[in-house]
Amino acid sequence: YSVPENKSNREVFVMNADGSENQQITRTPYQENEVTWIKGGTKLAFLSNDNGSSQLYEMNPDGSGRKQLTNYDGDIEGYSISPDGKKLLFISQVKTKESTADKYPDLPKATGIIVTDLMYKHWDEWVTTAPHPFIADFDGNGISNIVDILNDEPYESPMKPWGGIEQLAWNTTSDKVAYTCRKKTGLEYAISTNSDIYIYDLNIKKTENITEENKGYDTNPQYSPDGKYIAWQSMERDGYEADLNRLFIMNLETGEKRFVSKAFESNVDAFVWGADAKVIYFTGVWHGESQIYALDLANDSVKAITSGMYDYEGVALFGDKLIAKRHSMSMGDEIYSVALDGSTTQLTQENKQIYDQLEMGKVEGRWMKTTDG
């Protein structure tokens, strides 16, 4: 971030899994983001706006060999490459409403907004488009045969205003995509929190709603590594944005669904499957701290892995360890490696030069009994 220019710019850094050899590999005026390893770990894929629109690029792990992979007619806002590496799932906006200039072509310079229905605005964004998920063939150098999963439907997936690629997921065999969608419009859309998880079959071009009976938010699907289950976050009631965020799984063969996080009396936030599909790791808030937990699917028991006056955000599996961001009242976000016994290793030291000049205050917890004990 540049204070004189009042402008930020994202760059890409890489490091070894133990935190060593942390280095910046891009130094450009563009916005590199959503970086993932591809092609067996030999390349990095990322989004950037080099040529004015956000497109998919690749580069070597040292930052060399920067190459544009897509030239889509629109911004790519998120993406996921299929497990077999042959398909690209990406998000892009489609026009869903006529502008004033569309309605009155004799007034091409008109900037006024004509509002006749909800939802006409999300925070600071006028609603004129909707994000749609697209699937394309991907040969490693470009895309072809692009298909809009929602076709001409006026809905959004992922959901505005905060949803991203985490609301969509490939299955293990690369022939199905699970996506989050609230298939409502107008006033009904504006007052409802009833989204569902849909599964789109690439082979037969059909979509199935797997959460129709639940009336609250169903979001963020993830397939298990063995391909036998799908997990997602679920709220029970329509219209309650702050309802309990529960974790559900479904057996893809039998269709049996199970509320697996009953033992945790708080929201399930970020989650990731264990490599053996027998455990799910997740972050959740308890007593003012966001810790990492392990959910044993054999008996749905929950065990805290981390402790302390910290907040963990996001969680990824790396071998026999978890990788997560952590911050506290005394420290901004840094990346940590977390062993399953709860021991942690700080991998980044992005703000050390600042903290070394400061004497931080002591932070303590205080708990008081309420009238009901």
Model-identified regions with their sequence ranges:
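Short, solvent-exposed loop/turn segments at conserved positions within beta-propeller repeat blades
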Residues: 5-10, 49-54, 125-129, 188-195, ...
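Phosphate-binding active sites in nucleotide-utilizing proteins
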Residues: 369-373
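A short loop-to-beta-strand structural motif that recurs across blades of beta-propeller domains
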Residues: 11-13, 55-57, 132-134, 196-198, ...
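Conserved beta-propeller blade repeats
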Residues: 29-47, 66, 73-88, 120-133, ...
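Short loop/turn segments that connect beta-strands within beta-propeller blades
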Residues: 16-20, 60-64, 138-141, 201-205, ...
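A structural motif specific to WD40 beta-propellers
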Residues: 22-23, 67, 147, 208, ...
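Beta-propeller domains
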Residues: 2-19
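Predominantly five- to eight-bladed beta-propeller fold
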Residues: 93-152, 180-196, 245, 315, ...
